[in-house]
């Protein structure tokens, strides 16, 4: 019987690293283990880059930390492997498993598991591809306390001409992240949609939009002297000028998550936001 292959990534804090050490010790005899280099150095093991785990046939990756750890891991893969998130004290919506449940959960996965695929967003700035977004793409003013003027175009039609601090363009998965904090709707991740949430708009009539998931959304700055920042999943930043067009559409490959929780999405929302 071929052993299952499990990858590990983690925050580099002591508590997270020690949990990974315990999990590896527990499953080392029944699974082939791969550990990302930074974590491997702390554990005194040989490391394998996350992007290399794709080519080695890893079945799933265990991510110990929060949503940020998961998002950074997904960014490093062209065709993301399934990820199991173990929650280290955050209110993340991508981390399903508490540390005390980690061993039992992984035990169940050794005999098989289901994968939940989530749409990502392709992000193109001035015809150059940025990292695909799992949660959201944010266009935000580069100058604090200075609004930007921009057009929002969907499938060639002008949706809005906004004056605002920016706009958040989120997947259904990302609707419970930054977009929700800015007043956007909570969208069931099974819904194929793109959510657009203006940030502190000047017009009171500016409200969030929900458009079909196969839409092509374009953003264009109106004033030549203004610059804006394009932020993907809160970490990757690029600068946009009025000469550029930011184009957002459905990515070719989804993010993938191991189904580990019996609770449905609505139960998760109630528990996380209580």
Cite the ranges covered by each PLM segment.
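Gly/Ser-rich helix-loop-strand patches that form or flank binding pockets
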Residues: 76-77, 81-86
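ATP/nucleoside-binding phosphotransfer catalytic cores, i.e., glycine-rich phosphate-binding loops
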Residues: 131, 139, 144, 154-158, ...
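Redox-cofactor binding/interface segments in oxidoreductases and associated redox assembly factors
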Residues: 8, 63, 71, 169
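Short glycine/serine/threonine-rich phosphate/pyrophosphate-binding segments
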Residues: 16-19, 68-73, 176-181
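N-terminal glycine-rich "phosphate-gripper" loop used for MgATP/nucleotide binding
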Residues: 59, 63-67, 74-77
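Gly/Ser/Thr-rich active-site loops/lids in small-molecule metabolic enzymes
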Residues: 161-164, 169-205
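ATP/NTP phosphate-donor binding region
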Residues: 1-60, 99-115, 124-131
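Catalytic core of DAGKc-family lipid kinases
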Residues: 91-165
């Amino acid at each position: 019987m071929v052993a299952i292959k499990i990858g590990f990534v983690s925050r580099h804090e002591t508590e997270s690293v020690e949990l990974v050490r315990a999990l590896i010790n527990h499953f080392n005899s029944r699974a082939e283990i791969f550990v990302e280099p930074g974590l491997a150095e702390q554990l005194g093991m040989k490391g394998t880059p996350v992007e290399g785990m794709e080519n080695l046939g890893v079945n799933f990756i265990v991510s110990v930390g929060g949503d940020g750890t998961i998002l950074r891991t997904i960014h490093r893969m062209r065709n993301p492997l399934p990820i199991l998130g173990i929650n280290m004290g955050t209110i993340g919506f991508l981390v399903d498993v508490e540390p005390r449940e980690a061993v039992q959960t992984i035990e169940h996965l050794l005999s098989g598991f289901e994968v939940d695929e989530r749409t990502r967003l392709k992000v193109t700035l001035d015809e150059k591809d940025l990292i695909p977004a799992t949660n959201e793409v944010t266009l935000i003013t580069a100058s604090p306390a200075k609004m930007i003027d921009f057009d929002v175009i969907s499938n060639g039609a002008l949706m809005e001409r906004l004056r605002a601090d920016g706009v958040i363009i989120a997947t259904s998965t990302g609707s419970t992240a930054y977009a929700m904090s800015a007043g956007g709707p909570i969208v069931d991740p099974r819904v194929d949609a793109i959510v657009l949430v203006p940030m502190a708009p000047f017009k009171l009539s500016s409200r969030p939009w929900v458009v079909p998931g196969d839409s092509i959304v374009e953003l264009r700055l109106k004033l030549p002297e203004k610059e804006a920042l394009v932020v993907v999943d809160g970490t990757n930043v690029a600068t946009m000028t009025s000469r550029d067009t930011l184009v957002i559409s459905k990515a070719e490959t989804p993010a993938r998550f191991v189904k580990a929780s019996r609770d449905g999405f609505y139960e998760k929302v109630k528990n996380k936001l209580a």
